[in-house]
């Protein structure tokens, strides 16, 4: 996970190569965008989607970066930006009858979450 810092107390964390479709991650990110850190964690804990685990890891990382690098408390953080980008697609083939092979596409994505201080 990479970390960058802006001048106005924003901290960013990125997870690359997550084995999940960007569309499935985007429907979870839309629910937590703009919320406070603690509220977003609670939402992620009770949502029934597989994408919640890597998103919560990135959110934990962004909060740890904010605490370590800027000295911000986790209670004073809010999610200013949450986005997902398409990553490389791994292409595999499934053997089928009579010597055929059907393509299997394994999509990956890149999750970016930026947190900022509320105050």
Swiss-Prot record:
Keywords: Chloroplast, Plastid, Ribonucleoprotein, Ribosomal protein, RNA-binding, rRNA-binding
Signal peptide residues on this chain, from the entry's feature table: none
CDD domains: Ribosomal_L22
Xref: InterPro entries: Ribosomal_uL22, Ribosomal_uL22_bac/chlpt-type, Ribosomal_uL22_bac/org-type, Ribosomal_uL22_sf
Molecular function terms, GO-annotated: rRNA binding; structural constituent of ribosome
Subcellular location, record wording: Plastid, Chloroplast
GO CC terms, sorted: chloroplast; large ribosomal subunit
Chief location bin: plastid
A GO BP entry: translation
Quaternary structure annotation from Swiss-Prot or TrEMBL: Part of the 50S ribosomal subunit.
HAMAP family named in the record: Ribosomal_uL22_B
Family: Belongs to the universal ribosomal protein uL22 family.
Protein task: This protein binds specifically to 23S rRNA.
Protein name: Large ribosomal subunit protein uL22c
Protein species of origin: Mesostigma viride
Encoding gene (name): rpl22
């Amino acid at each position: 996970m990479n970390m960058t810092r802006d001048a106005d107390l924003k901290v960013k964390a990125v997870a690359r190569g997550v084995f999940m479709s960007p569309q499935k991650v985007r429907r979870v990110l839309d629910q937590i965008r703009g919320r406070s850190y603690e509220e977003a964690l609670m939402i992620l804990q009770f949502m029934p989607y597989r994408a919640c685990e890597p998103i919560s890891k990135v959110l934990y990382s962004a909060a740890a970066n904010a605490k370590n690098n800027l000295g911000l408390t986790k209670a004073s953080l809010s999610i200013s930006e949450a986005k997902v980008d398409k990553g490389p697609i791994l292409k595999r083939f499934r053997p089928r009858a009579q010597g055929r092979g059907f393509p299997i596409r394994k999509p990956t994505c890149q999750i970016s979450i930026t947190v900022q201080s509320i105050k």
